[in-house]
């Protein structure tokens, strides 16, 4: 499942941050991507919700510090939906 999540996130991140060659890692955070500001963060989260057909709670969104945190939340939500 993590591979499918990584593929989806890579596509979303490349589109939202306008970086077609961007490679994501679990440790990647807003400090690593020039265009990752607060507005881009919200846009990215909405794209993730739409792509994976999930909904984030405010506290979940506030707790995301890096891509690894995001993957963990997505996995949890997808497992809950099965």
For each predicted feature, which ranges?
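Phosphopantetheine-dependent thiolation modules in NRPS/PKS and related acyl-activating systems
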Residues: 2-36, 40-46, 50-82
């Amino acid at each position: 499942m993590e591979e499918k999540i990584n593929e989806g996130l890579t596509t979303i991140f490349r589109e939202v941050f306008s970086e077609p060659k961007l490679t994501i890692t679990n440790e990647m955070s807003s400090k690593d991507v020039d265009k990752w500001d607060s507005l881009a963060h919200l846009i990215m989260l909405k794209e993730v919700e739409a792509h994976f057909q999930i909904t984030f709670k405010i506290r979940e969104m506030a707790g995301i510090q890096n891509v690894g945190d995001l993957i963990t939340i997505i996995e949890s939500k997808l497992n809950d939906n099965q």
